[in-house]
């Protein structure tokens, strides 16, 4: 048989209102409630009242009903809640079959918070005394509020022994009377002090008062969780700004003065400016260029692959090494002092355009560029080669050691042809006569080396007093090795030319870009055709030029007119397009 659930949700608001009156005790006239089904089988409040006896008499014999009452058990002032489920035998069968499930639903969902649950099927189960006893037992320990009656003890009289009288009268015996014990005096009554103060229990606690939940309902406990809503960015920014930046906090110095951040910024600017000035001075030759030590050579074994850590081109490194190598020979030369050139002025006037292009990566300011342009003269025209003006004297003086110590090494000028692509620097003011030759074409043709593409300034009309001031201009050096001596550069020259080269070897070499500028090259002369074939080579690998004066070629390209300017770097001309420049010797193989 299917269960038939009851409908108590339709009138749940009315039932809940009466239930709260009973539980809270807000209405003294309502202490019990009975709900019954109507014609639509919907449970609703049927009757209410205040007498527990009337509550037990109003259950109907033909309906399944549920009742709730608030009762004060005897001997206690604590009220308890009792719920009664009435299921008589005369009720419909289907309703009685579903009584247990429906009673549990009513007790758990509708009448919550009861103390005693009773199931009644006839009038015997609704006995008032039995129900009150159940409620009293459910209340737990009971503390009587009635004063216990004092038991009055009756004064016990000692038993009196009867005297024994024999038949024969003996001599009279005296009767001993019992010794009366003195009764103790009653204790004096302690006079009770009448204290009007209600706090006589020494607990100093306020008297408990019954709380009216309608007037002062219980407040729900507030959770400690605070939900995070929309973030106030302005508040967060203000808090962050209020914090002190630890980077700006300066520790007190020994003198107790605070460090100003603006002074630190100014110091950094000054340091960067001094660094740029030192780089300019090293380029102009006012400071001594750093020398290549053995440790640096060991650390930088392959500069072609690793790059130039000192940010200098191969030509500069080679020129520095040559200048250092020939510095001993240059000290023995005697040269008259130059009154027209003061010592504090720079020795050379390098090309301003090349200066700008060289230091473009250093982001030089416009002010510094203007100072450099004002300081140096404009460069000479490239269309016409500059001719070195002769010095005011014709014969060198005797070498003086004191003057040699005062004369800077950069006063010695080089004479020769620079390689293609190298920077040409003009020095017309400080290049008084080091050679007495006029750089005419006849002298160039007479001093031509056996290699066709190389123009060497010969000293045919040069005086015998100054053979050491001429030298063939060197080419770009290798990046990781020291070039071979000058005698190995032209092994095919005639014996007369070798003697002349040895005489010219004592002259100072071509300076680096950081020292005084070299003189401009002489006018190129048309090379004479030699019957002997010039060296040529075939490219074994592809090579891309890293600088303007280098040669770019691919595999199997033919390079002609090779000049062996160094062990690792050669100068040659590409056959297919006629371009000329330096190339690494390990990228090609010689054909003759």
Curated annotation (Swiss-Prot):
Sequence repeats: 200-209, 436-445, 566-575
Modification Phosphothreonine, positions: 165, 181
Molecular function GO terms recorded: actin filament binding
Gene3D superfamilies in UniProt: Severin (3.40.20.10), SH3 Domains (2.30.30.40)
Outcome (variant: residue 96 to A): In ABP1-3; reduces actin binding and abolishes ARP2/3 complex activation
Classification via InterPro entries: Abp1_fungi_SH3_C2, ADF-H, ADF-H/Gelsolin-like_dom_sf, SH3-like_dom_sf, SH3_domain
Annotated stretches, region: 3 X 10 AA approximate repeats (acidic): 200-575
Other remarks in the entry: Present with 606 molecules/cell in log phase SD medium.
Protein name: Actin-binding protein
Source species of the chain: Saccharomyces cerevisiae (strain ATCC 204508 / S288c)
